[in-house]
Amino acid sequence: MSESEYVFTVFKRHWKTLIKWLLHITGLPEITVDELFERVNSDQPPLMIDIRSAEDFNGTGYSTYGHIPNARSIDILQLESSIEDLQPFKDKEIVTMCPGGGLSLAAVEILTEAGFKDVKSLKGGIGLWRKKGYPTTTS
């Protein structure tokens, strides 16, 4: 799938959430990059789900900086079909992330509707995480 087809498919599926994000009216839970940095270094870090493409996650696509260490790669287009694999985390803290913090709100909606209890979006996304100088990796 080309990058433009990918973007169109994602927008077609999640346009309502993206519009709400643009208007700042989502009402969905978010976590700041500073809060996540503290949580990542705690005794019980959250499950981090990076919803970008595998290429962006690995630093070989549009985003060349990779991902937050210990984040799990699940493309937004595959998230619904991955719900079963995520069941062990149903009652645990989960943080979803994307480049800017908008599309990860759609992931929060998907997981919340599937019964997950503590799901938040990374406010400002991986772009803000990187801008603040927090670590990323391509491995």
Which positions does each model-derived feature cover?
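Flexible, polar/low-complexity N-terminal or interdomain linker segments that lie immediately upstream
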Residues: 1-63
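A short helix-to-beta-strand connector/capping loop
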Residues: 26-27, 44, 68-70, 117-118
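Conserved beta-strand scaffold positions in the cores of enzyme catalytic domains, especially
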Residues: 30, 48, 71-73, 119-121
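Short acidic active-site motifs
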Residues: 35-36, 78-83
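Short, flexible helix/strand-to-coil boundary loops that buttress conserved ligand/catalytic motifs
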Residues: 61, 83, 133
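A short alpha/beta connector and helix-capping loop motif
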Residues: 61-77
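Catalytic cysteine-centered active loop of the rhodanese-like fold, especially the PTP/DSP P-loop
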Residues: 74, 83-130
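Active-site neighborhoods of enzymes that stabilize oxyanions during catalysis
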Residues: 133-139
